[in-house]
């Protein structure tokens, strides 16, 4: 996997993925940025959330669950000293659908955390205290 990150000016960088996509990262104004994009550390959390969400939604669809919507809310704490690495991270999945089986949602979240989500597993291997939780919301008619 290859990516390129190019400095634009101030604290703004443009990342280009090997799959041909670009994104802007920027810092806050007090650090020379213009706040035009997420911070690089936020990008790490967004990537982990996307990775885990891909797994969970895919597994629920394979289990023929009627998923209408899904999101993951991530709360992370960072060390006070530099390097300000992540120390704790919780992924809370909120899955809405019709007649969802809790056992299927629980299994999807657990399998993502323990086996499939490379990003989450990498955080855990680096010493981040990881936790995962979920909530199920019933959604009306199909």
Model regions and ranges:
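Extended beta-strand/beta-hairpin segments
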Residues: 1-46, 57-142
């Amino acid at each position: 996997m290859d990516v390129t990150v190019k400095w634009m000016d101030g604290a703004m960088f443009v990342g280009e993925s090997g799959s041909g996509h670009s994104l802007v990262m920027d810092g806050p104004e007090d650090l020379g940025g213009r706040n035009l994009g997420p911070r690089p550390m936020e990008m790490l959390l967004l990537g982990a959330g996307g990775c885990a969400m891909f797994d969970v939604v895919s597994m629920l669809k394979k289990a023929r669950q009627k998923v209408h919507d899904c999101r993951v809310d991530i709360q992370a704490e960072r060390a006070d000293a530099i390097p300000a690495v992540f120390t704790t991270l919780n992924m809370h999945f909120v899955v809405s659908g019709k007649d969802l089986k809790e056992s299927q949602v629980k299994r999807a979240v657990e399998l993502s955390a323990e086996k499939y989500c490379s990003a989450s597993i990498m955080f855990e291997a680096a010493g981040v205290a990881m936790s995962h939780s979920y909530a199920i919301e019933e959604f009306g008619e199909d």
